[in-house]
From Swiss-Prot:
Keywords linked to the UniProt accession: DNA recombination, DNA-binding, Transcription, Transcription regulation, Translation regulation
Family affiliation: Belongs to the bacterial histone-like protein family.
Gene: ihfB
Protein name: Integration host factor subunit beta
Role played: This protein is one of the two subunits of integration host factor, a specific DNA-binding protein that functions in genetic recombination as well as in transcriptional and translational control.
SMART domains the UniProt entry points to: BHL
Keyword Transcription annotated: yes
GO cellular component: chromosome; cytosol
GO BP of this protein: DNA recombination; regulation of DNA-templated transcription; regulation of translation
């Protein structure tokens, strides 16, 4: 599901709210989540999961085109850990 599909689905389920208001709310929520993570804070949504930053240590990688070794710097990457309820609901396909 893309962001625009999410907005369309929410707008159709909440017909009393203008589609533009739904779009603005979704965009604002995602922007707030991104800025919270950028500040190094953790986001927890009970029953859904948590978002945090994990440190990826420096390492030697390879250029896929040339095969040359490339030194990659350490960096923080976003990480999502699903909550138990989400894991249980997703397990109906497994």
């Amino acid at each position: 599901m893309t962001k625009s599909e999410l907005i369309e689905r929410l707008a159709s389920q909440q017909s009393h709210i203008p589609a533009k208001a739904v779009e603005d709310a979704v965009k604002e929520m995602l922007e707030h989540m991104a800025s919270t993570l950028a500040q190094g804070e953790r986001i927890e949504i009970r029953g859904f999961g948590s978002f945090s930053l994990h440190y990826r240590a420096p390492r030697t990688g390879r250029n896929p085109k040339t095969g040359d070794k490339v030194e990659l710097e350490g960096k923080y990457v976003p990480h999502f850990k699903p909550g138990k309820e989400l894991r249980d609901r997703a397990n109906i396909y497994g």
